[in-house]
Amino acid sequence: MTGHHGWGYGQDDGPSHWHKLYPIAQGDRQSPINIISSQAVYSPSLQPLELSYEACMSLSITNNGHSVQVDFNDSDDRTVVTGGPLEGPYRLKQFHFHWGKKHDVGSEHTVDGKSFPSELHLVHWNAKKYSTFGEAASAPDGLAVVGVFLETGDEHPSMNRLTDALYMVRFKGTKAQFSCFNPKCLLPASRHYWTYPGSLTTPPLSESVTWIVLREPICISERQMGKFRSLLFTSEDDERIHMVNNFRPPQPLKGRVVKASFRA
């Protein structure tokens, strides 16, 4: 077992087993998906996406046994996403990553069948309508997750502060202070996106997410990517299992429409 709660990414507890504990895994709006770019519907009514992130709202960095996660102060609307397909602001709660063992897999969403080495998820919640993140996470319009693909190539200078902190959270269950990191530095120049109704990609797999997947990837170096792959699924006392391939494969679209903010 690579995780707590009886789920992980191993042979015996990986995505193909999740439906036993979480039947919604076979639901009608599951994520991720394969985005077929030619079938995405250009929607001129979609608003431009605005990510208004204040500089000093990050709190901590954690290895939760499934990913590495940076948590934020979400007590007010200082760090929000607005526009796009959303009505009103959604507050940033945390961001985390999914990645592969090698560069040919790692992302959760795929585009025309192509995987990227990694995918960043910025998780936001609808604080106008719901009083807690937990309440929002089980409501159909409760969450908005911005997905950013990572490819490898040139070094990403802003990513160094994050990758240089990973040694502090190598083991599952470890946490370190991580203040004043603005995730705006991890966004690509273009705000073009695809959007569709979906779910969390980890248990409980709640169908509460408006997905906003940015078209343009960001680039990090193989050295930086290697620091993610040196994290462990396991605690300090356990046999070491490297944290790699922590992604769920694409799920059936089941009639959902993927909208695009741009003309193909």
Curated annotation (Swiss-Prot):
Sorted alphabetically, which keywords does the UniProt record give? Cytoplasm, Lyase, Metal-binding, Zinc
As one GO molecular function, the record gives: zinc ion binding
**Binding residue positions for substrate:** T201, T202
Q: Which PROSITE patterns does UniProt cross-reference here?
A: ALPHA_CA_1, ALPHA_CA_2
Q: Which superkingdom heads the taxonomic lineage of this protein's source?
A: Eukaryota
As recorded in UniProt, its EC number(s) are 4.2.1.1
Q: Which cofactor does it need?
A: Zn(2+)
Compartment(s): Cytoplasm
Q: What does this protein do?
A: Reversible hydration of carbon dioxide.
This chain's protein is named Carbonic anhydrase 7
Species of the source: Homo sapiens (Human)
The gene designation is CA7
